[in-house]
Amino acid sequence: MMAAFVLVKMTASGGWEEINTLHMALHAIAGVKTVHFVAGPTDVIVFAEGADQATLAGTIGNIRQTQGVRSTDTRIVWPV
């Protein structure tokens, strides 16, 4: 199992309707476990898991292609 935190910047100003739409769209992606809207330079933090690297990469690609996502910055979680 592989996991990642994906830091997302939104394209829109972040009105409630846009936030709700993006929240639902991100939650609908296979592999996405949690979606948190946060204050600061990052608008959203997504936690995602995949059975292997290819599956996780596919999930991250789907996050990037979601309408309302301007950019992403991914942090792979290393098991310790």
Which residues make up each language-model segment?
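A compositional/biophysical signature of low hydrophobicity enriched in polar/charged and small residues
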Residues: 1-80
